[in-house]
């Protein structure tokens, strides 16, 4: 009986861990997500607004300013869902930047699930326009 309980607990833990999406899966090069062009702002302004947007109902788990990458895990909402925010180029002053937002939830299917997060784009626009 005791061994059965241990096995059940181990199985439940592995199912739970297996259902979490890894932030490593969020890559700009995989063709997923949605891209937007941002003009009239510099890299620092975009970076600050991206951090605000990626902190709203999410916890930032990876951030690398030199490469323009922020990755967050959703706190309120779909458990295990992750979101990536990619800024290109990372030069300080260029005419326009491309912002790509990619999201993935555990056991996501391409047929039903969206691969980006509209609320992050809305939060980003609010943050960048409030400065």
Predicted regions and their residues:
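Short, linear, compositionally biased motifs with a strong N-terminal bias
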Residues: 11-14
């Amino acid at each position: 009986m005791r061994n059965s309980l241990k096995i059940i607990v181990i199985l439940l833990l592995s199912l739970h861990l297996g259902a979490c999406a890894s932030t490593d899966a969020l890559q700009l090069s995989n063709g997923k997500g949605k891209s937007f062009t941002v003009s009239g702002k510099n890299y620092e302004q975009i970076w600050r607004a991206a951090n605000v947007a990626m902190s709203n109902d999410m916890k930032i788990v990876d951030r690398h300013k030199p490469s323009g990458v922020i990755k967050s895990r959703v706190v309120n909402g779909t458990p295990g869902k992750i979101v990536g925010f990619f800024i290109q180029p990372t030069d300080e002053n260029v005419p326009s930047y491309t912002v790509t937002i990619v999201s993935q939830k555990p056991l996501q299917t391409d047929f039903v699930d969206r691969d980006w997060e509209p609320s992050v784009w809305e939060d980003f626009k609010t943050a960048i326009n409030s400065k």
